[in-house]
Every structure is written in structure tokens, then in C-alpha cells.
């Protein structure tokens, strides 16, 4: 009896690790330390708040049909849209530099090299960079209809994430 769920780009409260790299990126942006717009900024991703994913997993366990796959996506947005919404909710607007994928991958390799020297694992790896370079516009209609799944709008989730970072003194 197996039901499969597929979440996309998850953000929100959680560990400060590669598995929560999107929240790390949000934190760095709000702190003024993230100035990169991947490629030309038009790459699309589906962004979903962590609590929506938790609720989606529970709904899939309770209502999901065996052998079925459910996409637990959120709002589809380009990087331009994502950072525009982040600037709005954080009330901080920074000039972002468009960085081509090959240069981003080279930077990722540099971070891996730095890990060998410091022993501290990188928060962003070449694998993460590759994964986030693809267009990932997703549709969760099946999960909405069959499971009752829903998700927070991106702006609202970003606001909750920033509030959580402030409460935990992770923001300067």
C-alpha cells in the first residue's frame, strides 16, 4: 500500500542545511548577502511553504489512493517574481546580478573545495545549483481534488519565513 508524494522547492522554518537551502537563500537576501539572480531570472520554480508539505503528506496518508502519485506544489514563480515578492515582504530591495549557470556551477565547485579545507559542509552545492536551474512549473490539481490539499500564497509564506528567522535571531 504505497502512495507517492512529490514536493518541489520547499522553504520555511527548519534546519540550516543543504536540505533547506532555499530558506538559507532567503536569509542571505534579507541580510544583504545574496545578490545573485540565477541565469536571466526567468527560470520558473514551484515554491511551497514547509507546513503545506507536512499537511500534504498527512492528507496523502489519510486520503491518498495506493499506487498514485501526488504533486504537492505551491505557487509557480520565476526568480524575478520570487525576488520581487521577497523584496516586498522584507522591505529590502537589492540590485541582483544575473549570473550564468556555468559561473554558478564554478562557484559551487569552489564551495566544495572550501569544504575540504574547512571541514564545514556547503549550504549550496553544484547539485543544488543544477536542480534549481531547471524550469519546474508544477500543477497540484490532482492533490487538491483528491486530497483536499492547498498551499499558502508565496508572499504569505515568505512573510512567515522572515518572521520565523527574526524570532530565532537568524536575521541581522
Regions found by a protein language model. Name each.
Residues 19-20, 94:
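Acceptor/aglycone-binding surface of glycosyltransferases and processive sugar-polymer synthases
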Amino acid at each position: 500500500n504505497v502512495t507517492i508524494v512529490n514536493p518541489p522547492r520547499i522553504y520555511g522554518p527548519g534546519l540550516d542545511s543543504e536540505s533547506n537551502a532555499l530558506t538559507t537563500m532567503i536569509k542571505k537576501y534579507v541580510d544583504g548577502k545574496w545578490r545573485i539572480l540565477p541565469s536571466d531570472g526567468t527560470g520558473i520554480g514551484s515554491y511551497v511553504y514547509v507546513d503545506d508539505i507536512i499537511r500534504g503528506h498527512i492528507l496523502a496518508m489519510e486520503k491518498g489512493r495506493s499506487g498514485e502519485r501526488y504533486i504537492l506544489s505551491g505557487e509557480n514563480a520565476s526568480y524575478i517574481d520570487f525576488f520581487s515578492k521577497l523584496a516586498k515582504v522584507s522591505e529590502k530591495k537589492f540590485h541582483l546580478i544575473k549570473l550564468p549557470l556555468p559561473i554558478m556551477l564554478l562557484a559551487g565547485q569552489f564551495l566544495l573545495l572550501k569544504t575540504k579545507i574547512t571541514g564545514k559542509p556547503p549550504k549550496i552545492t553544484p547539485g543544488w545549483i543544477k536542480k534549481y536551474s531547471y524550469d519546474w512549473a508544477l500543477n497540484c490539481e490532482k492533490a487538491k481534488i483528491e486530497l483536499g490539499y492547498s498551499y499558502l500564497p508565496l508572499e504569505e509564506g515568505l512573510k512567515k519565513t522572515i518572521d520565523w528567522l527574526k524570532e530565532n535571531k537568524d536575521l541581522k
